[in-house]
Design a protein with these regions (language model features):
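Ribonuclease/tRNase effector modules and their secretory precursors
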Residues: 1-97
């Protein structure tokens, strides 16, 4: 899977949420991650919200879209933050005990 993101946007995200987009990219490897279509924020492009584990035990919420360049698909990360307690609960309910 290939990723892309805006470096300026990533720096803003790090200052605001303490999460780099590189760290967020690891959530896509989580087999228990939950990916949901974000209809409310998909006016100009389809946006998706991925809830899953990054490196270690950190559960993140990653907003992203998919881009296609000459038949090559990329995941464009838009924002990422630590999951709320409620989001963590949703994630943990999906995982095997």
């Amino acid at each position: 899977m290939k990723f892309e993101w805006d470096r300026k946007k990533e720096n803003i995200n790090i200052k605001k949420h303490g999460v780099s987009f590189e760290q967020a990219s690891y959530v896509f490897a989580d087999p228990f991650a939950l990916n949901s279509y974000d209809e409310a924020h998909s006016d100009t492009e389809e946006r998706w919200v991925l809830l899953g584990k990054s490196l270690g035990k950190t559960i993140l919420l990653v907003v992203h879209t998919f881009r296609d360049y000459d038949g090559k698909e990329f995941v464009r990360i838009i924002s990422a933050r630590t999951a709320t307690k409620k989001e963590e609960k949703v994630y943990k309910e999906r995982c095997p005990k």
